[in-house]
Amino acid sequence: MPDNNLPSWRQDLKSSRKKEGKSPSNRWIQLATVSEENEPRLRTVVFRGWHKDSSMIIFTDRRSEKIGHLKSNPNAEILWFFLKTKSQYRFKGKIHELSDNKNYWDLLSEKSKSSWFWGSPGEKINKKVKSAYEILSNLPKSENFVVLNFEIDSVDLLKLEQPVHKRYLWEKSKKWEKVEINP
């Protein structure tokens, strides 16, 4: 049953995710940012859920490159592709850090929590430290743990249907407005 309080693109996305089943692509999204040198940067991150009606939640390490990128330019784009429905969603918006992230930390497994205490992303691994990837328990919230809130301004959906592809654009002003556009 459709949730009338959600934007219509959320219904389409929910349908795509349901058809995708337990595939990793159901949670893996591609996040594009712009570096301090004004160069594009792209990486795969994990979709962690929704904040309010139309903001995505992403976890990251405070020491990662993307934190610097987002501080200098909060504009970002997320691409989410579903193979079974041949649907490509492009989300444009701004990313900000959520200051109240304790509840999200509490949802993580001990294995996941341990990873926030490992070495900095992109640094050479110190093999002399045996406990570098040790799984610990009862860990306090790491200062490296960051919850990002991706506030979506527009959604571009391309359905690779045959014989004709379909494309829709939603833009948020006071409310979400949907327009069918040429693929």
Locations of the language-model features?
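Structured loops at beta-to-helix junctions and adjacent beta-edge loops in soluble globular domains
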Residues: 34, 61, 81, 94, ...
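A short mixed-secondary-structure module that forms the rim of ligand-binding clefts
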Residues: 48-86
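Charged, gly/pro-rich active-site loop segments
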Residues: 2-4, 87-183
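An N-terminal domain-cap segment
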Residues: 1-53, 68-69
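A short, aromatic/hydrophobic, helix- or strand-capping loop or linear motif
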Residues: 24-25, 81-82, 118-120
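Short acidic, glycine-rich loop/turn motifs
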Residues: 33-37, 80-84, 159-162, 172
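Short beta-strand or tight-loop elements
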Residues: 27-29, 43, 74, 143-146, ...
